[in-house]
Amino acid sequence: MTVFRQENVDDYYDTGEELGSGQFAVVKKCREKSTGLQYAAKFIKKRRTKSSRRGVSREDIEREVSILKEIRHPNVITLHEVYENKTDVILILELVAGGELFDFLAEKESLTEEEATEFLKQILSGVYYLHSLQIAHFDLKPENIMLLDRNVPKPRIKIIDFGLAHKIDFGNEFKNIFGTPEFVAPEIVNYEPLGLEADMWSIGVITYILLSGASPFLGDTKQETLANVSAVNYDFEEEFFRNTSTLAKDFIRRLLVKDPKKRMTIQDSLQHPWIKPKDTQQALSRKASAVNMEKFKKFAARKKWKQSVRLISLCQRLSRSFLSRSNMSVARSDDTLDEEDSFVMKAIIHAINDDNVPGLQHLLGSLSSYDVNQPNKHGTPPLLIAAGCGNIQMLQLLIKRGSRIDVQDKGGSNAIYWASRHGHVDTLKFLNENKCPLDVKDKSGETALHVAARYGHADVVQLLCSFGSNPDFQDKEEETPLHCAAWHGYYSVAKALCEVGCNVNIKNREGETPLLTASARGYHDIVECLAEHGADLNASDKDGHIALHLAVRRCQMEVIKTLLGHGSFVDFQDRHGNTPLHVACKDGSAPIVVALCEASCNLDISNKYGRTPLHLAANNGILDVVRYLCLMGANVEALTSDGKTAEDLAKAEQHEHVAGLLARLRKDTHRGLFIQQLRPTQNLQPRIKLKLFGHSGSGKSTLVESLKCGLLRSFFRRRRPRLSSTNSTRFPPSPLAAKPTVSVSINNLYPGCENVSVRSRSMMFEPGLTKGMLEVFVAPSHHLHCSTDDQSTKAIDIQNAYLNGVGDFSVWEFSGNPVYFCCYDYFAANDPTSIHIIVFSLEEPYEIQLNQVIFWLSFLKSLVPVEEPIAFGGKLKNPLRVVLVATHADIMNIPRPAGGEFGYDKDTSLLKEIRNRFGNDLHVSNKLFVLDAGASGSKDIKVLRNHLQEIRSQIVSGCSPMTHLCEKIISTLPSWRKLNGPNQLMSLQQFVYDVQDQLNPLASEDDLRRIAQQLHSTGEINIMQSETVQDVLLLDPRWLCTNVLGKLLSVETPRALHHYRGRYTMEDIQRLVPDSDVEELLQILDAMDICARDLSSGTMVDIPALIKTDSLQRSWADEEDEVMVYGGVRIVPVEHLTPFPCGIFHKVQVNLCRWIHQQSAEGDADIRLWVSGCRIANRGAELLVLLVNHGQGIEVQVRGLETEKIKCCLLLDSVCSTIETVMATTLPGLLTVKHYLSPQQLREHHEPVMVYQPRDFFRAQTLKESSLTNTMGGYKESFSSITCFGCHDVYSQASLGMDIHASDLSLLTRRKLSRLLDPPDPMGKDWCLLAMNLGLPDMVAKHNVNNRASRDFLPSPVHALLQEWTSYPESTVGILISKLRELGRRDAADFLLKASSVFKINLDGNGQEAYASSCNSGTSYNSISSVVSRRDSHAWTPLYDL
């Protein structure tokens, strides 16, 4: 449902005189306070209920507003704003003050056809615009054709009143009967499908009247008029058309055609010779012909007085009928009165509904003998209708005219009842003051208090009770008003009735109290209120059920908690002897069973059939409930009335799993042991994980060995020999001896990264695709990631170790070789109870040290998803604990005082930089540990040990204590690993089954999930979770992380077929990991995005991480491509221009391989991979995906034939969606954005290529431009050519930059805004002032946290503010940026300029859609496909056929 502005319109506009009114709308002149400009305010009365006939339905109002928002034309009225209050929707419209066109023309002495056509052209122009948008007005008539200003030389026409207008969907048939009889088309009268043609008929009628002063189809009655229309019964009478030209008659004749298909269209009308003469003779003929002004003036006058004359005539006839009533026969009297009363009553009711007091007063003044107490055909007198509408002036008028205050409708309801039903407090006060009876019952026994309670009017209930209304009256079903409130869930009403002292324990005909009713229907707040006001919690209905029974039966958990909290008797038995626990066990609701047992219910009560709750659960085969009852001590040997145990019942119903469980629990000693195993012990968790990250050669392995050394062992420990730099790539040459700014370790990460600066640099110009970062590859063998070192860590080395002076750890050492990085996302940041050590070498220059640390911290940060709801300041509840360690302090001769610690002069600046970037995302220790990793007995190592021990103690104290079952599982795991054979993977469901089957049958799935999480925390197992891998347990992490991945991805593995392209057969994989089930292994590797299986090529497997070749073409040849279109994007991180975490591009390549394998069933698609890119060919379109800018961006370039723009759009969008999905799932904490490449430079193969950033588009939009300047080429490029290859069909359905709805802002973007704007600003430039600027002052009081003690984990007020504000359709990114700038928060505005999407396809052609962003940025494939599917000029090939 569309939400309009909820502010009080009077705060923004001064309302003046009434300009006009209709059945359900009043138009008043108004002035905008801020600008002084005048507008017209149209107050549309809303329909309160769907069944009501008073007011306009919400759907009709929204349709009118939607159409008005869409149209902008000089000859059509313009919508300014829309407000809404409780009763009305207020449209602020352009003020059209010139009056009706026909009134203006009637004042003229003469009028030629040429002059008339000038006005008609304006009408046609407006209708042409509407029809071009597929909008049909359906109510074109003289009253709706106005002049903007009649006092100018050439008045401008405005078409108004779009209440009946519809957007025509040619795919769906539309029929309706509406409009003014004189002007409706035959298809409306005949209830045939309607379209734009209906407006053309109306234009024909208007033209006929304009030229002649006569109406072509007007009859004496409405039925005669409609009959004339249907028969097209008209002619050009000489009296009226003697001076009319032949062309004018031909124009009318072509419009008044019964068959809509043969009727002139708006385009035909504009080209008709009468409107657009083809030669001089036609023009002169038009100028010589004249409008019949005599008749036209009479028509205008007749129209003005027509309604008044009819009313007077009818009123006179009515008066005469009253005077002669006594002289008429009964039958005659009834007939006449029925007919005439129907008319008068309709007029009265219309006046009441329209709040037209003067009109009703005038009407009743003309009907001096009319009895205003007589009811309408539904049995309702006018006074009651007026009471329902709430107009006190109307009531005063009716009472003055003789209405009885105690009049009733045919159902026995009086005015108090009607006013109460509709919630009119002031009306009730008026009626009470005028002695209207208060507690009158209608035919169903209901009073006004009943109906007020049923409709939820708490203020009315309070008022009626204050008048003295009896709150305990019962209707014919013996229900009180409190029953009504409890049934419908109106808490405020129930509270009001309780506070006035009503009897809360009255029962209805079914024996239900209000408490029973509220409990059954789940209204826990009402249950709470009733309990606090003395409701009997154990009152029962006719079946002996108390409230707790009914709540359990309906699974109303909140109600159950409330009843138990107030002391409801948990063991109450109904007439069948069933307690609430019996009901819960029969229905199988485990959470409710748990709640009842925690309330100390009796587990072994038998019902009338001798069955306990355990019998019912076993009989129904509900294993979880049976297990829990047994755990809580239920008697498994209890017998039913016919001598059967629960086990017997389970066997009889063939519930073998339940019977087996009960059989194992026959002996109490066994059950006691099982129960004891599940209880927490005093033992703390024995071990947590210690994870080490760092580049190759940073000293991770050496540091681990040193930490393991005890004092005595450290004296005898021999330092590992340092190999010569000329013989080993693990220890690169000293930076002083080689290039001063080049780090081999950073080269291991990305070729060319030696030039990466820690500060953000411009991405405006980039090196060519065949130069720069890829020049480092002379031959595959020269790539450092192919080097071999027997001492280097393979994949992830895992060992359980005791670190001397610290404690037990599961140590996970992550290799610094980039070939392994594609598997780290599943293991690096999946446990907040781990300690993460980032190790870097002081041998590197400071800039490289900082880059290395930032790289690993960015990796960890990117792996942590956004938590919802976003906390105050965007903080995380459990940030990862990180320790920074700098090694090789001895080699670099870092100064150290005698017996002291190393003193690194850059530690303060490094820590400051790290905290600025990662302080909100990671818990980084305040100290940088500078040490010699091999000196196990040094003070520096000791200080590090103390710090690790302190962190370990904090983490372990927050972990759950161990249970005997967890310890038992740990001792059993080795045998399970051995039994599991070649693969150590197990589903959680299988794990639960095995534990229950072999170790403890009473352990529930929830128990075992907690234990599995604890085992995961200790490093015994690893729980693998992602969108593709869910609840998979890795029983032996070493098997996968060290053995399988270490062998599969290692550069030491034997060469296999196509190894240079990373392409293997199943047999190759089997040879690499001979001890594994290759089929199952590939399934998990495929799910981890390490490989992609190509089923279309037999049993081939792509593993991009193993690709060695870099000799493939990485750009398009410099050839003549005059008929080709080019385009592309670059996906980059938003906040810091750092390399993407390594391994992500391998995953992108895997997903593109998988995508192409799915597309190429017929062999039409092809993909070629190399180290830092891939090339895709797909039926006339080609695509390059490249890792560029030293790993800081992923570039997607597309080219295709000029005639295949749609294919290019689809291909680019699909690949970008694939990449963004990989980013969002693999690195959920990384915010990315798309930059756009210059299509002209791509076409010219010009390097470097211009890169357009979001702020470039926003700046151009602000300047009202639709193109961007390529400063390199010296020319401009249009938005459409940059974003969608110049494809008009796609571009026309898109929103651009500032016009994109703000709800598309991702969670990561919102979290960043929370960090910027949540903290109080000394100058007040924070979220509070932003809320005021956005027109949401109520949010300030609602979310103000200044008075609260702690802000650590309060919800973010900025997030709440954006959620509220983005629910409005006019909330765009551009408005938000402008509001932030007005606030003085340029930092937040600049961030949005960097992070916002540039181009978004709108699914809804009318404008807004249900906004839901599923990616970090960009458009979705589905949206562009939907645009393509609506094109009916070509049959586009689906993407999978491209």
Curated annotation (Swiss-Prot):
The active site is at 139 (proton acceptor). Ubiquitinated by the BCR(KLHL20) E3 ubiquitin ligase complex, leading to its degradation by the proteasome. Residues 267-334 are annotated as: Calmodulin-binding. It comes from the Eukaryota. Activated by Ca(2+)/calmodulin. Regulated by a locking mechanism, involving autophosphorylation at Ser-308 and calmodulin binding. In the inactive state, Ser-308 is phosphorylated. Activation involves its dephosphorylation and a release-of-autoinhibition mechanism where binding of calmodulin induces a conformational change that relieves the steric block of the active site by the autoinhibitory domain. Activity is modulated by UNC5B and NTN1. UNC5B activates it by inhibiting the phosphorylation at Ser-308, whereas NTN1 inhibits UNC5B-mediated activation of DAPK1. Calcium/calmodulin-dependent serine/threonine kinase involved in multiple cellular signaling pathways that trigger cell survival, apoptosis, and autophagy. Regulates both type I apoptotic and type II autophagic cell deaths signal, depending on the cellular setting. The former is caspase-dependent, while the latter is caspase-independent and is characterized by the accumulation of autophagic vesicles. Phosphorylates PIN1 resulting in inhibition of its catalytic activity, nuclear localization, and cellular function. Phosphorylates TPM1, enhancing stress fiber formation in endothelial cells. Interacts with KLHL20. Interacts (via death domain) with MAPK1 and MAPK3. Interacts with MAP1B (via N-terminus). Interacts with PRKD1 in an oxidative stress-regulated manner. Interacts with PIN1, PDCD6, BECN1, TSC2 and STX1A. Interacts (via kinase domain) with DAPK3 (via kinase domain). Interacts with GRINB. Interacts (via death domain) with UNC5B (via death domain). Interacts with UNC5C (via death domain). This is Death-associated protein kinase 1. It comes from Mus musculus (Mouse). The lineage of its organism: Eukaryota, Metazoa, Chordata, Craniata, Vertebrata.
